[in-house]
Each structure stands twice: as C-alpha cells, then as structure tokens.
C-alpha cells in the first residue's frame, strides 16, 4: 500500500493487488493535481506486464483534470496490451466522466 499526502488533510491512498496478470488498484481520497503525479508514477511501475487493469473507485471522493489525464494514459497503454475498467464509481465522479466525455472512453462498471 502506498500513501501520498499533499500537505493538508487531502490524501490519496493507493492499494494494489496483483494476481497473475490482473492488477486491481484501489484508490481512496482525492485524485487531484497534487496526488496525480504519485498515481502516475505508481502505475508506470506496475502496469508493464499486466493484461487486465481494474481501477476501484469505491472510496475515491474527487477527481480533477490531472487525475483524468492519468486515467487516459493508463487507458492508452492498456488498449495495446489488454483491458482496463473502472468500477464502483460514485455519482459525482460519473457526472465528471459524463461532462468530460470520459464516459465514452473508459469501461465503467
């Protein structure tokens, strides 16, 4: 488990579970301009040999454009080597996906 604090009370907890070539990433907290670089670095370290990526947003409270950029980067990589889906998306984050068009780019369950 990786914890990243961004100065104040805002924090992003990243927990990864790798089974065979299936990586599940659990995010808790806020994915914003401060925490997105840590997620991006964490994903670069983990995604290389993965054929299935699952992003679990059950405990994600917020996502900014910087977080969306990280998701897009992961989606581009996974479209070449396997599949990616986002699960347990809150209504607020689903609305952000709809407004930005990410609802049509990502597989959301």
Please place each PLM-identified region on the residue numbering:
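STAS-typified acidic loop motif
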Residues: 4, 10-39
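Intrinsically disordered, low-complexity repeat segments enriched in small/polar residues
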Residues: 5-6, 96
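Short acidic-hydrophobic, aromatic-tinged amphipathic segments that line or gate anion-handling sites
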Residues: 107-109
């Amino acid at each position: 488990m990786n914890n990243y604090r961004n100065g104040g009370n805002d924090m992003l907890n990243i927990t990864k579970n790798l089974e065979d070539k299936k990586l599940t990433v659990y995010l808790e907290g806020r994915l914003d301009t401060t925490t997105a670089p840590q997620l991006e670095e964490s994903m670069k370290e983990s995604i290389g040999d993965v054929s299935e990526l699952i992003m679990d947003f059950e405990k994600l409270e917020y996502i900014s454009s910087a977080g969306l950029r990280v998701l897009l980067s992961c989606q581009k990589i996974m479209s070449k080597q396997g599949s990616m889906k986002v699960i347990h998306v809150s209504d607020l984050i689903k609305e952000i996906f709809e407004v930005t068009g990410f609802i049509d780019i990502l597989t959301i369950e």
